[in-house]
Swiss-Prot record:
One of its GO terms (biological process) is glycolytic process. It comes from the Bacteria. It is an enzyme of class 1 (oxidoreductase). It catalyses: N(6)-[(R)-lipoyl]-L-lysyl-[protein] + 2-oxoglutarate + H(+) = N(6)-[(R)-S(8)-succinyldihydrolipoyl]-L-lysyl-[protein] + CO2. This is 2-oxoglutarate dehydrogenase E1 component. It comes from Bacillus pumilus (strain SAFR-032). Pfam families: 2-oxogl_dehyd_N (PF16078), E1_dh (PF00676), OxoGdeHyase_C (PF16870), Transket_pyr (PF02779). Keywords: Glycolysis, Oxidoreductase, Thiamine pyrophosphate. The lineage of its organism: Bacteria, Bacillati, Bacillota, Bacilli, Bacillales.
Amino acid sequence: MFQNDVKQPLSWEEFHGPNLGYVLELYDQYVQDPTSVDEDLRGIFDELGAPPSEMKEEIGKKENSVVTSEQIQKIASVVKLAEDIRTYGHLNASVNPLRKEKELQELFPLKEYGLTEEDVKNIPISIISPDAPKHISNGIEAINHLRNTYKRTISFEFDHVHDFEERNWLSKSIESGELFKKKPADKLVSVFKRLTEVEQFEQFLHKTFVGQKRFSIEGLDALVPVLDEIISESVTQGTSNINIGMAHRGRLNVLAHVLGKPYEIIFSEFQHAPNKELVPSEGSIGISYGWTGDVKYHLGADRQIKDEDTKSARVTLANNPSHLEFIDPIIEGSTRAAQELRTQKGYPAQDVEKALAILIHGDAAFPGEGIVAETLNLSQLVGYQVGGTIHIIANNMIGFTTESNESRSTKYASDLAKGFEIPIVHVNADDPEACLAAVQLAVEYRKRFKKDFLIDLIGYRRYGHNEMDEPSTTQPMLYDAVRKHKTVKNIFADKLVSEGLLTKEQREEIEQAVATRIEEAYQKVPSKKEHTIQEIELPEPVSNGFPAVDTSVEFDVLRKLNEELISWPDDFQVFGKLKRILEKRAKVFTDDRKVEWSLGEALAFASILKDGTPIRMTGQDSERGTFAQRNLVLHDSQTGNEFIALHELSDANASFTVHNSPLSEGSVIGFEYGYNVYSPETLVIWEAQFGDFANAAQVYFDQFISAGRAKWGQKSGLVMLLPHGYEGQGPEHSSGRTERFLQSAAENNWTVANLTSAAQYFHILRRQAKMLLREEIRPLVIMTPKSLLRNPNSLSEVQELTDGQFQPVLEQPGLVHDHEKVSRLVLSSGKVSIDISDRFTQMEEPKDWLHIARVEQLYPFPAKDIKAILSKLTNLEEIVWTQEEPQNMGAWGYIEPYLREIAPEKVKVRYIGRRRRSSTAEGDPTVHKKEQERIVSDSLTRKN
């Protein structure tokens, strides 16, 4: 509506009489010092420009044009009154359905501004409300119009929005009256039908499944027609993907009525009855289940919809655990993925009109959970913005038993959004027409400005936090009011009947039809007694694990890719020291030099792009690399211009994205997970600055990445790079907490690797890329190196890239001995393996009693590879597991039972490493060095 409604420019002709003299005086002040006048007047004068010279002459000729100081004060007071109504009117709006608000007149009486009605009546309308409807004929009508506009069951906050164009558009949209035009009768009756479905569905569940948790929507029933309207308006404008994130409050109702999940399936989930045969055969709705499953109010769904013009769109409600707001960045990531075309080299082509993100927040969770602020911070960042998200706070004014004054330090649940200059609308959930107006403003603002918008939908909670909870024990007065309060369906029906838009007979027919449909659906649900509950087995592709895949790349292909990776425009000035480092890479394929870690990564990326697989990589400092190792984005030392060689590859067949992320682990890894789930063909990589900081995103590891497929059937091939290794840098820069990933390792849910060579890194990345669209795909966690990035013992021959493949276990290079003499097998993983290798090569005493191997893939446990080594060592006495982490950390707790299971009879399994500790590492580098030397020495010293 509003995008085509162009505002008429202001003209000096609108000012006359005493007011003209006053305005000219203010304009003179403005010319001398723009800051001496009100911000809104500055905007007006910016638009008006200088007044016509004849106007100044005319005003000087007229005796009655002399403006007294009293008149000036009157006009200034009216301007102040108008601005106060806009800025503070929300404080007295009727947005709380359970409380009658004070009249706005009491908040802004004319006498407090030194004004009378006659004073205000003579002020030009354009000074008070330049966008007022045409029927407004004088100043007092304009003020009353503002009062009525800003004191309704909908109120507005946008004083914190600093952009003049946005503020101007918002005020025009609100004050023009277009927003509040009466909707067609059939539209309003349709909303009533929807509210009837919402209410009767909840009431049926309440009486049929007594005491079962469902987290009812009642009190915020309007959420469903609000979502209907957002989706309808967006699809009409050409949006083809709508992604919704929400917690469990009201989820079942949204699933049933917005996503079209059949009542029968939801009822069967309450009865724990079989429901596979209840899924619609036409496939209009996608419902995924894992093998362990999840409670019904965590599940999501997909739906294909069409509008009247046959425009099609995919609507998705994402799966979400009870970690309420942690779905937020996942929705943002999936929306960004839906907006991007990744089939051409360079950055993906983004079209923000293709997809819309809708986030439904809780009033306690929005200010209470930090992930919300982290997600809002992504909204204007080039690597993460989605052209605006529509936020809805499902505000029932309570969090479990905690009231708002106990759960936030702000007046409104929405106040956090002000820091990000997001316009806010507060709306009474008992007024569906006001709710539709809020949606209209939100959709048009997002379309016009490509920014976020927030609707604070204020209602109440009819029952307790869940249906087994009695809320009157903690909120007796509140729930006395709730019990007496009519439902929104009945309030709205009474209104429509009184306006002659709905007859009582039509109302009863609609209610009866809905009740019949619900009852018929219930009768289709099989009885729980008719089936035997059985545990669901893992899908065969998951249980079988990864098949062997060829990840080698021909020599000539790699050589050409390498040449292009170290090429840049002739007039591009690469920083001198970096230029010398990069130029050395040219000799790898000519002078028989070895491949170091970052070159192995770059070659892997280049070859993956050649294969047609898009890549997206983000993380703190990921463009350069925390340790200055990567340098995928070059900066001209003279101009600062950027150059990305991976964007210029002649044979690239897919896009490459790399972005430095904000200083946030949670929102960023959530975003990347969402991107990967929506775009499974893309190799999505998140890199921690140090692995130690990854636990700031622990919720995503625990609830989504490790368990999402088992719970929801939600596949992911996300790659996580966690710099890890003990180098004397203390407890914040040593450990990626390998033990936590291994603790969650089961059912082939992810790969956990701790690598020691560039070739291994090259091959595991290529393997992951090749598996992306296969059923066997799983996330990949790599403990990446720091000091090993440039360690000679982590370098690889080019032949290892052209001929080899990823090896779950590597035997120590240079082992030459009689296997029958070996009494100890030393197993380790990651950096300590290189420490052991360095010491081993320096040993002068006999080594024939030792055999050494590196476990590169910790999970899934490479039993076959280790058994193959054990089969050669016929006189083995002990298996030693060496690690640099404390005994209660690292891989020992995970790997010990595996080693004992495969160890030959009478072969001991022993631990060498740091003792059990509460902190990951020593803070003193001297103590670290001494301890590290002991660990390596003990591993290579024969027991007497």
